[in-house]
From Swiss-Prot:
The keyword DNA damage does not apply. InterPro entries: Ribosomal_bL12, Ribosomal_bL12_C, Ribosomal_bL12_C/ClpS-like, Ribosomal_bL12_oligo, Ribosomal_bL12_oligo_N_sf. The gene is rplL. Gene3D superfamilies: 3.30.1390.10, Single helix bin (1.20.5.710). Pfam families: Ribosomal_L12, Ribosomal_L12_N. It comes from the Bacteria. One of its GO terms (cellular component) is cytosolic large ribosomal subunit. The keyword Hydrolase does not apply. This is Large ribosomal subunit protein bL12. Belongs to the bacterial ribosomal protein bL12 family. Homodimer. Part of the ribosomal stalk of the 50S ribosomal subunit. Forms a multimeric L10(L12)X complex, where L10 forms an elongated spine to which 2 to 4 L12 dimers bind in a sequential fashion. Binds GTP-bound translation factors. GO terms for biological process: translation.
Amino acid sequence: MSKIDTIIEMIEGLNVLELVELKKKMEEKWGVTAAAPVMAMGVAAPVAAAGDGAAAAAPAEEKTEFDVILKEAGPNKIQVIKVVRELTSLGLKEAKDLVEGAPKPVREGVSKEEAEAAKAKLTEVGAVVEIK
């Protein structure tokens, strides 16, 4: 096993707080910063909050955006397609392709309430749905 592989395995075994400490020490040692590019600022915000210690780590783990994933259409595929069209404003062909290509996301980055409402509508017509 190479040195790189050994290092990767060691890093995989670290928890979040240990990773934050490692990042800080690497920045201090080599005078670099691990700042994310401007386009990835939505991803960088939770990492920055976790760097403030264990107290800040708990709020950073609370999820505010959810994805509604259609796992399986179930027996009432036509009804599921109608609900998918209602939820997404997709055309008939696009909604049919989404339903037939399950598992696929129906809604992404929505609030918990919207995700629960979408899941309820889809499960009501027999679809198998997961919220991530």
